[in-house]
Regions:
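Hydrophobic beta-strand scaffold residues
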Residues: 26, 46, 110-111, 152, ...
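Rossmann-fold dinucleotide-binding core
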Residues: 91-170
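Helical "substrate-binding/catalytic lid" subdomain
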Residues: 161-285
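Glycine-centered short loops/turns at secondary-structure junctions
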Residues: 23, 43, 107-108, 191, ...
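Hydrophobic residues within alpha-helices
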Residues: 15-16, 35, 100, 144, ...
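NAD(P)+-binding Rossmann beta1-loop-alpha1 motif at the extreme N-terminus of oxidoreductases
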Residues: 1-62, 90, 119, 151
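Rossmann-fold NAD(P) dinucleotide-binding segment
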Residues: 50-108
Length: 288
């Protein structure tokens, strides 16, 4: 299939590489052009603009936030004028996803397909893809999704449903990290090591991947290089808050999580992993 890919950060580069590996014809674009070089060396075409990348069957965007997606779609040389079905893998607001769906409706079509998984999952094609949009559009994209991931979840025909699932999932991940970090701080202050607590928890009732993956990160203080940077986590929690406000859903845990993300960014800088909230929690308890 002829595919355009826009957004070549660590996640996007890995996803695009897997599309190449699966034999798809790929054009790539990134705001910093040098990010495209490794993929071009492997056979991708370096598109001259987002719209150039969108001269394809499908154009995928994997960008940091709403403003980056808006620039790629609506800016000069944006993809809205292209012929490709637009698939957004970005974690964006529900409101922007609704706007994109409306604006693409009379053109090529739009699918929201955010992913769950850290960079190593992207590199090994083990992502989980959450897709929403017209069934025929998702059918077209499913071979592409399976080149990058291990499972596709279809969550409805309204594209923003996938973004709501992704934001809800990210809130649950961050809440699990918050709870583990608080529990580890309590245990450690009472003389029980973090590793010991984690072994008990994951060996009994908390064996899910989120506890195993982030528990190890918290035990080892493995916060750099960031698999998912704290400012992006804070951005996502702000999007959760916007969705909760729009739906009048109280989410008190969200406020705690956001405060700890703000604290660790202020204390450690923007290159810290979002699991670095554990540092802010320890400092609050006088152990950091």
């Amino acid at each position: 299939m002829k595919v355009g890919f826009i957004g070549l950060g660590r996640m996007g580069s890995a996803m695009a590489a897997n599309l190449l590996r699966a034999g798809h014809e790929l054009a790539v674009w990134n705001r910093s052009p040098d990010k495209a070089d490794p993929l071009v060396q492997r056979g991708a075409r370096h598109a001259t603009s987002p719209r150039d990348a969108a001269e394809a069957d499908v154009v995928m965007t994997m960008l940091a936030d709403d403003s980056a997606v808006e620039a790629a779609v609506y800016g000069e040389g944006g993809i809205l004028g292209g012929s490709a079905l637009h698939v957004s893998h970005s974690t964006i607001s529900v409101a922007l996803a609704d706007r994109l769906a409306a604006d693409h409706q009379e053109r090529s079509g739009f699918v929201s397909a955010p992913v769950f998984g850290r960079p190593v999952a992207a590199e090994t094609a083990k992502l989980f893809v959450v897709a929403a949009g017209l069934a025929g559009h998702i059918d077209l994209c499913e071979p592409l999704f399976m080149a990058m991931g291990q499972r596709v979840f279809r969550v409805g025909t309204r594209p923003s449903a996938a973004n709501l699932v992704k934001l809800s999932g990210n809130f649950m991940i961050m809440s699990a990290v918050e709870a583990m970090a608080e529990a580890m701080t309590l245990a450690e202050k009472g003389g029980v090591g973090r590793a010991t607590l984690l072994e008990v928890l994951t060996g009994t009732l908390f064996g899910a991947p989120v506890y195993q993956t982030y528990g190890d990160i918290l035990v080892e203080d493995r916060f750099r290089p960031a698999g998912f940077a704290a400012p992006l986590g804070l951005k996502d929690m702000n999007l959760v808050d916007a969705a909760a406000t729009a739906s009048r859903v109280p989410m008190p845990v969200l406020g705690v999580v956001r405060d700890h993300l703000r604290a660790v960014i202020a204390q450690e800088g923007e290159d810290i992993d979002w699991a670095g909230v554990g540092l802010a929690i320890r400092r609050g308890a006088g152990t950091g």
